[in-house]
């Protein structure tokens, strides 16, 4: 640190008497200086020290001045007890007084409130207030200072107390110095730094100590002993340094922690005041003898560099070591002035005023940044330069070099002929390092630490400023006093070249032939003997490692990444590929690597090209180089062919084609142009009209047309090249039916594969006629049948099957399945039958039936079971070996059909809100179903639902006894929760009814006229004669029908013919009524006289032996058959192998209708109504027209 005087002035009054300067203040922009001298306020221009104007207004000595932070006004305080406010235009605008002389003034940096302090009080004035608020104090105030945020004012007192007040003047903190009244506080100042978290107050007292306190009153660090009485303490603008002046007649520079760094401008009298110019390194001081001096402080750079580690001084007392590659930094706090720094490998030497510290790295890691103290030499040294080695330090003093061990013992000394201008460690074994020394007389020496003799390398005419030696120690670069860079060959001492405008030079540590030098605002890079490459760069080059150049600009060291492109291209121009590769390894861009690789490839230096392509990870070119190397191993040495491949890869196709031709490989040129779709150029290389090559070319041209989305052109080209399959695929994919038709008709029927492809696309495009035509052309009848089936063109399929019966299964089975899917079961059945697949028909129907039951479609289930039964009957007729099993299934399915048909009504009654059935019908249905159910109910049929329906209808119709019995039976079953309440309620309420049934409801047997119970253990047969009841299939009332059987020997045909004869007999109906007329009245009388009785042979056959448990059927002979009327006989004409069933109506007046397909009996009125509703039989769903036939 040096203090350079800028200007000095001596202040006198008119009588030439010296005027003491008690205070100074800078205008915030630094252009003006306000001086308190005698009883005047002087205003100076800081640039040259000229006085702008003296301000008069005070009548006595001016003790203090202060400038507002906004630069609009300043204040002065005097021994005349007054404070004057001045504007920046140097006009006085306000004056106010205290009771005692004014000791100090200070402006609030935020609110611009002015604090003025006297011996007995302090006042606070602001422009907004008319009056000044004053506060009494117990001791004389000597100094004051506001915090940065303007919230608190610190007052320094004569009794050794620091009082910290808020903006309103109230005391918040009181700091008492140990010396008390013997240590008056003479100057205080808050640190203006914005980086510190705490406000720090510097306190200087006349106990000759400098102390630091936080706002809370807590002391920071220990008291610093000054050795003189301090009169003024002041901070630099950023708070990094403090200046203190006083009785030692000089200004001293301290760190912000109070470490003394050195003196600034020694004077002849006490220095009462000192201030730092805002945001600069200028200091002004005011003395007792009227001296006003303005100094510039120059902080020299103290630093050291070794390869990528740079150490420099910070805040005068700290050393920062920076790793230039990783940008890591470490701070070493020395707490003393750092004078010199040296760094070498893992060693760091720091010289302080009274000692030298040697540090070493904590570990061997190249990126380690942890230093620890290795040795300490407690001795004062005076030296110009300091160098550190592995086990020694070297001190340079003018012409002398001294070598000391780390213990401080002098081991060796060298005396030079001239002043030493430059010294550098150039490496070597530990304890035997070499040093490069440059002298003022131009001599350059090499010194080894363990050798007392210096070796002269060379001597030049001009003085040395900078030196560096190349990596292999063969070349030496020197910068002389004329800023010329000279490069010598150390062996021959020859000057290799020289370059102007250099202030520093450095060889590349990784490349022998590269160096860089800086000067004139430019960075110059020189490779071998090539011209210098320049780029703009401010500062000094101090190191060059690979592609990084270490540059020192003012105080900061930076690593500049410099692409080595320019020198690399210089080598490339001369086809020096290997040297260019070495340069590229130092650091070039990917584009430069690619350029190097391409140039080397074209120069057929495959080794260099391969390395370069590996760098840019270009696999295509690496494959090419690999293939060329393989071919070379096989003895292929045609460089033209290799170069042609290279040009082809680079896209230089015409050059490649010429080289292929030159090498006699026209076919390669043809392949290349073909692959590139450059068909016009390819045609030039077609041989002597080889049709194979021509066809290949057209095919590839078509492929290209296809890829560029010109498919029609491509298809036409495929056709002309004979690639029919590709043309068909392209046409089919784009739906061009016209082109497909044209191709299919042109193709020969022997070309089966393309024709089948055409047919496939016709099918896909829904042009089935053309597909059929194509299949006919190739005679593929099976495919044609499949086409008809897939498109459901059944008529054409049947016509084809008639001519070709072997395809019967191919048509009828899919047809039957299609019919079944469309609920056309009868037709499906026929189709299955035609295909001979009765088992399939049964399986499909069984599945449909099961689904209907699961989905609670019981009506459909009944219908499907009836269909199944008829299917089984059909099978039993055709296959005798299965007859018994099928007949058994027939009866089972007939029974199930009847059960589901009945349960449909019960299900609807229990699960739907409304029922279309009468109570009597539901009553009959539920009884019928209950009697028909065996122990195990069929899937889906609920016994609870059946009993619940019967119970409700019994109660409604007056069959209370039956209802009670049914409710009791329900108690033994698991009842769903939805019925539980209703059933429990019904069970209770039925007990209020009489325990008997309505006689109207009791069923009667028409054979034996026996009344039957409602709940019959035998089922739907008479308990007396065991005759099976015949029910109406709609209302399930018992019909007046009795089944009879034919005597042995009477065939069905004969029986029908005998009944049809209908022998004449008197009508019992006509004979039983008598008509009588008398006067105006007509009377009909039913007369049951004996003469009315006629004999009926069938009635006699109804009798049976009472008390027998076996059923005795009614068997009739020919005579009885002759007596029967045809309209009284109903015949169920079952197909074989079943026998016909005969029924005789005992009440001819009751009209009964039987469905001719399912043979279910109905009351005629019910049947007609149901047929009108559904247009079919309600049981078997045969359309009415079909039924009537």
Swiss-Prot record:
Name of this protein: Intraflagellar transport protein 122 homolog
Start-end of each WD repeat: 16-54, 57-97, 99-135, 137-175, 180-223, 225-264, 266-306, 459-498
GO terms classed as biological process: cilium assembly; intraciliary retrograde transport; intraciliary transport; negative regulation of smoothened signaling pathway; protein localization to cilium
Subunit note: Component of the IFT complex A (IFT-A) complex.
This protein's GO CC annotations: ciliary basal body; cilium; cytoplasm; intraciliary transport particle A
Domain of life: Eukaryota
Cystine residue pairs: none
Species: Xenopus tropicalis (Western clawed frog)
Location within or outside the cell: Cell projection, Cilium; Cytoplasm, Cytoskeleton, Cilium basal body
Keyword set, alphabetical order: Cell projection, Cilium, Cilium biogenesis/degradation, Cytoplasm, Cytoskeleton, Developmental protein, Repeat, WD repeat
Pfam family, one: Zn_ribbon_IFT122_C
Function per UniProt: Required for cilia formation during embryonal development. Acts as a negative regulator of Shh signaling.
UniProt xrefs under SUPFAM superfamilies: TPR-like, WD40 repeat-like
């Amino acid at each position: 640190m040096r203090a350079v005087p800028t200007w000095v002035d001596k202040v006198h009054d008119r009588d030439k008497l010296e005027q003491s300067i008690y205070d100074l203040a800078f205008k915030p922009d630094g252009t003006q200086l306000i001086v308190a001298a005698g009883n005047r306020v002087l205003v100076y221009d800081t640039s040259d020290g000229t006085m702008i104007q003296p301000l008069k207004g005070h009548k006595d000595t001016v003790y203090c001045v202060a400038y507002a932070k906004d630069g609009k006004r300043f204040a002065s305080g005097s021994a005349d007890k007054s404070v004057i406010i001045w504007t920046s235009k140097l006009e006085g605008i306000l004056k106010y007084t205290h009771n005692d002389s004014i000791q100090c003034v200070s402006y609030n940096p935020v609110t611009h409130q002015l604090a003025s302090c006297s011996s007995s009080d302090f006042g606070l004035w602001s422009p907004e207030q008319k009056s000044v608020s004053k506060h009494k104090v117990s001791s004389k105030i000597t100094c004051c200072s506001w915090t940065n945020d303007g919230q608190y004012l610190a007052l320094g007192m004569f009794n050794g107390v620091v009082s910290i007040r808020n903006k309103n003047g109230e005391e918040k903190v009181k700091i008492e110095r140990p010396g008390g009244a013997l240590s008056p506080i003479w100057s205080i100042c808050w640190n203006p730094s914005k980086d510190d978290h705490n406000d720090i107050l510097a306190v200087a007292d006349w106990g000759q100590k400098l102390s630091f306190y936080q706002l809370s009153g807590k002391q920071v660090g220990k008291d610093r002993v000054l050795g003189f009485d301090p009169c003024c303490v002041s901070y630099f603008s950023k708070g990094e340094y403090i200046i203190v002046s006083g009785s030692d007649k000089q200004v001293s520079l301290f760190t912000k922690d109070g470490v003394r760094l050195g003196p600034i401008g020694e004077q002849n009298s006490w220095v009462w005041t000192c201030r730092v110019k805002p945001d600069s390194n200028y200091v002004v001081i005011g003395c007792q003898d009227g001296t006003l001096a303005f100094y510039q402080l120059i902080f020299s750079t103290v630093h050291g560099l070794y390869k990528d580690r740079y150490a420099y001084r910070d805040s005068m007392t700290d050393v920062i070591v920076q790793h230039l590659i990783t940008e890591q930094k470490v701070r070493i706090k020395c707490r003393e002035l750092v004078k010199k720094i040296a760094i070498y490998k893992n060693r760091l030497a720091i010289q302080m005023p009274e000692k030298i510290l040697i540090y070493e790295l904590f570990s061997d890691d190249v990126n380690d940044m942890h230093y620890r103290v290795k040795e300490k030499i407690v001795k004062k040294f005076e030296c110009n330069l300091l160098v550190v080695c592995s086990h020694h330090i070297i001190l340079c003093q003018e012409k002398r070099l001294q070598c000391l061990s780390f213990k401080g013992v002098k081991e060796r000394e060298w005396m030079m002929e001239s002043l030493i201008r430059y010294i550098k460690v150039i490496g070597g074994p530990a304890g035997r390092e070499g040093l490069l020394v440059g002298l003022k007389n131009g001599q350059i020496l090499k010194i080894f630490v363990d050798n007392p003799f210096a070796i002269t390398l060379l001597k030049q005419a001009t003085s040395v400023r900078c030196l560096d030696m190349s990596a292999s120690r063969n070349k030496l670069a020197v910068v002389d006093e004329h800023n010329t860079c000279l490069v010598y060959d150390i062996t021959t001492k020859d000057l290799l070249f020289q370059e102007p405008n250099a202030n520093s030079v450095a060889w590349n540590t990784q490349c022998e032939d590269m160096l860089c030098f800086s000067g004139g605002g430019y960075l110059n890079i020189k490779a071998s003997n090539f011209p210098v490459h320049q780029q703009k760069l401010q500062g000094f080059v101090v190191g060059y490692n690979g592609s990084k150049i270490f540059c020192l600009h003012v105080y900061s060291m930076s690593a500049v990444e410099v692409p080595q492109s320019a020198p690399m291209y210089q080598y490339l121009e001369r086809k020096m590929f290997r040297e260019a590769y070495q340069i590229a390894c130092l650091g070039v861009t990917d584009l430069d690597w690619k350029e190097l690789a391409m140039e080397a490839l074209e120069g057929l230096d495959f080794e260099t090209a391969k390395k370069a392509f590996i760098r840019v990870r270009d696999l295509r070119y690496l494959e090419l180089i690999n293939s060329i190397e393989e071919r070379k191993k096989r003895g292929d040495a045609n460089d033209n062919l290799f170069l042609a491949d290279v040009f082809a890869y680079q896209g230089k196709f015409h050059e490649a084609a010429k080289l292929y031709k030159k090498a006699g490989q026209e076919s390669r040129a043809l392949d290349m142009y073909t692959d590139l779709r450059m068909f016009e150029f390819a045609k030039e290389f077609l041989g002597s009209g080889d049709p194979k090559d021509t066809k290949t070319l057209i095919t590839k041209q078509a492929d290209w047309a296809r890829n560029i989305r010109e498919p029609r052109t491509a298809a036409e080209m495929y056709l002309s090249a004979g690639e029919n399959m590709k043309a068909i695929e392209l046409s089919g994919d784009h739906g061009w039916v016209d082109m497909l038709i044209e191709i299919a008709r042109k193709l020969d029927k022997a070309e089966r594969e393309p024709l089948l492809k055409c047919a496939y696309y016709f099918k896909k495009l829904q042009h089935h006629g053309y597909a059929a035509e194509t299949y006919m052309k190739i005679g593929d009848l099976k495919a044609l049948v499949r086409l008809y089936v897939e498109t459901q063109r059944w008529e054409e399929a049947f016509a084809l099957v008639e001519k070709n019966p072997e395809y019967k299964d191919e048509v009828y089975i899919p047809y039957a399945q299609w019919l079944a899917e469309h609920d056309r079961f009868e037709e499906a059945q026929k189709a299955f039958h035609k295909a001979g697949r009765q088992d399939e028909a049964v399986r499909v129907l069984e599945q449909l039936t099961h689904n209907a039951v699961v989905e609670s479609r019981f009506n459909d289930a009944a219908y499907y079971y009836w269909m199944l039964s008829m299917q089984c009957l059909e099978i039993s007729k055709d296959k005798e070996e299965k007859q018994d099993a099928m007949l058994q299934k027939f009866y089972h399915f007939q029974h199930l059909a009847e059960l589901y048909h009945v349960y449909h009504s019960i299900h609807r009654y229990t699960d739907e809100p409304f029922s279309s059935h009468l109570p009597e019908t539901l009553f009959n249905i539920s009884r019928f179903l209950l009697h028909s159910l065996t122990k195990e109910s069929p899937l889906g049929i609920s016994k609870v639902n059946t009993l619940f329906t019967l119970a409700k209808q019994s109660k409604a119709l007056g069959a209370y006894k039956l209802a009670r019995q049914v409710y009791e039976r329900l108690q033994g079953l698991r009842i769903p929760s939805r019925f539980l309440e209703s059933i429990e309620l019904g069970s209770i309420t039925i007990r209020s009814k009489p325990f008997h049934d309505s006689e109207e409801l009791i069923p009667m047997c028409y054979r034996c006229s026996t009344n039957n119970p409602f709940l019959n253990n035998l089922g739907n047969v008479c308990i007396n004669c065991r005759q099976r009841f015949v029910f109406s299939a709609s209302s399930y009332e018992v019909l007046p029908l009795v089944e009879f059987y034919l005597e042995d020997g009477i065939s069905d045909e004969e029986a029908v013919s005998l009944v049809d004869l209908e022998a004449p007999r008197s009508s019992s109906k006509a004979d039983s009524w008598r008509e009588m007329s008398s006067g105006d009245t007509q009377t009909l009388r039913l007369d049951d006289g004996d003469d009315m009785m006629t004999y009926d042979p069938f009635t006699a056959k109804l009798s049976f032996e009472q008390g027998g448990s076996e059923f005795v059927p009614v068997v009739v002979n020919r005579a009885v058959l002759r007596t029967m009327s045809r309209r009284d006989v109903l015949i169920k004409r079952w197909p074989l192998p079943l026998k016909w069933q005969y029924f005789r109506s005992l009440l001819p007046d009751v009209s009964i209708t039987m469905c001719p397909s399912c043979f279910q009996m109905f009351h005629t009125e019910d049947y007609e109504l149901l047929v009108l509703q559904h247009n079919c039989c309600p049981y078997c769903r045969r359309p009415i027209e079909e039924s009537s036939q």
